[in-house]
Amino acid sequence: ATCAGQDKPCKETCDCCGERGECVCGLSYEGKYRCICRQGTFLIAWYKLASCKK
């Protein structure tokens, strides 16, 4: 999946602020699709991921 405004497609797996999860495209509060982290049905907000230092 590729999110609008993203240079790269969402990865299948990623480090979600230290928690393992699946990166998926999701609708943010801005009304834009962003890469977000999903762990089962639990979503970690994209802005929290963006604030994580890689």
UniProtKB/Swiss-Prot annotation:
Keywords: Disulfide bond, Ion channel impairing toxin, Knottin, Neurotoxin, Secreted, Toxin, Voltage-gated sodium channel impairing toxin. GO terms for molecular function: sodium channel regulator activity; toxin activity. InterPro entries: CNTX. Disulfide bonds join C3-C17, C10-C23, C14-C52, C16-C37, C25-C35. Pfam families: D_CNTX (PF17492). One of its GO terms (cellular component) is extracellular region. Its main location: secreted. It comes from the Eukaryota. Transmembrane segments: none annotated. It is found in: Secreted. Expressed by the venom gland. Belongs to the neurotoxin 03 (Tx2) family. 04 subfamily. Blocks voltage-gated sodium channels (Nav). Causes immediate spastic paralysis and death in mice within 1 minute of injection at dose levels of 1.5 ug per mouse. The presence of a 'disulfide through disulfide knot' structurally defines this protein as a knottin. This is U7-ctenitoxin-Pk1a. It comes from Phoneutria keyserlingi (Brazilian wandering spider). The lineage of its organism: Eukaryota, Metazoa, Ecdysozoa, Arthropoda, Chelicerata.
